Amino acid sequence: MARMHTRRRGSSDSDKPAADEPPEWSDVDEDAIEARVVELAEQGHSPSEIGLKLRDEGVQGTPIPDVSLATGKKVTEILEENEAEPDLPEDLRNLLERAVRLRDHMDENPGDYQNKRALQNTQSKIRRLIDYYRGDEVDENFTYSYDNAVEALGLE
């Protein structure tokens, strides 16, 4: 599949191993995994950071290579069940942070046309995602602006 804002081809990734159950050496109780996921979320980690921490550090010293194989649920599903989900979806939050960072850079460096275009592309992606999430995970009346992004991220 092609990239969104360039004429280049997309990048190919390696495939995840086809496995129906977690490896034998990773035999941690589902409840312990879910408790650790909620604990990491309360510490302020995003769902992808939680997955990385479980892969690297694990639960009770045992690494968890794939949360969905071990529990039958995705990290975001576990967070929703325990009412610990973030206020904004992770992909939208990352794009908003990038847009705020680029806008601050553009205020200091108005002649940086390369990053001006990067900001425009990022804002386009944000508007597209807001339309996708509107009503469910984003307020129905939310529209993108720099001030709204700063407020949504809590950077005021």
Curated annotation (Swiss-Prot):
<dbReference type="GO" id="GO:0003735">
    <property type="term" value="F:structural constituent of ribosome"/>
</dbReference>
<comment type="similarity">
    <text>Belongs to the universal ribosomal protein uS15 family.</text>
</comment>
<dbReference type="GO" id="GO:0006412">
    <property type="term" value="P:translation"/>
</dbReference>
<dbReference type="GO" id="GO:0022627">
    <property type="term" value="C:cytosolic small ribosomal subunit"/>
</dbReference>
<feature type="compositionally biased region" description="Acidic residues">
    <location>
        <begin position="21"/>
        <end position="32"/>
    </location>
</feature>
<dbReference type="InterPro" id="IPR023029">
    <property type="entry name" value="Ribosomal_uS15_arc_euk"/>
</dbReference>
<feature type="region of interest" description="Disordered">
    <location>
        <begin position="1"/>
        <end position="67"/>
    </location>
</feature>
<dbReference type="InterPro" id="IPR000589">
    <property type="entry name" value="Ribosomal_uS15"/>
</dbReference>
<keyword id="KW-0689">Ribosomal protein</keyword>
<dbReference type="InterPro" id="IPR009068">
    <property type="entry name" value="uS15_NS1_RNA-bd_sf"/>
</dbReference>
<dbReference type="GO" id="GO:0070181">
    <property type="term" value="F:small ribosomal subunit rRNA binding"/>
</dbReference>
<comment type="subunit">
    <text>Part of the 30S ribosomal subunit.</text>
</comment>
<dbReference type="Pfam" id="PF00312">
    <property type="entry name" value="Ribosomal_S15"/>
</dbReference>
<keyword id="KW-0687">Ribonucleoprotein</keyword>
<dbReference type="InterPro" id="IPR012606">
    <property type="entry name" value="Ribosomal_uS15_N"/>
</dbReference>
<feature type="compositionally biased region" description="Basic and acidic residues">
    <location>
        <begin position="10"/>
        <end position="19"/>
    </location>
</feature>
<dbReference type="Pfam" id="PF08069">
    <property type="entry name" value="Ribosomal_S13_N"/>
</dbReference>
<protein>
    <recommendedName>
        <fullName>Small ribosomal subunit protein uS15</fullName>
    </recommendedName>
</protein>
